[in-house]
Amino acid sequence: MKDHNLVEDYNYQEIIVERRPLLNSEGGPVEGLYNSWIMLNNPTQYNSYTTEAVKEIILAFRQASCDRSVVAVVFSAVGDKAFCTGGNTKEYAEYYAGNPQEYKQYMRLFNDMVTSILL
């Protein structure tokens, strides 16, 4: 079978990605089948996503989609305060404010992220 991943291995910095065994109705693992857990990992800022996180989310969903042993994806977050509060306002204020061409590029990434989650 052909490998359809864009990269071989990736060391995620902004998110956590785990493959967890699929469980049968008795609670035991189903051999060779997994759920992919993709978790935002910025609890101190209520899991707001940075540009780097957006790129990692796209890649993680793409990798899960290409993995023939993954049967479901769980999109979650670290911490108990918020799943996600949206884009990182600190990054917006420092980099994207007053820089419309760069913000346009960011919005392209954002739209790609939404598409990767929905597909």
Question: Predicted segments — roles?
Answer:
Residues 1-78, 101, 112, 116:
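Conserved CoA-thioester-binding segment of acyl-CoA-metabolizing enzymes
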Residues 79, 89:
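Short, flexible active-site-adjacent loop segments at beta-strand->alpha-helix junctions, enriched
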Residues 82:
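Flexible, gly/ser-rich surface segments that form the specificity/activation loops bordering the active-site cleft
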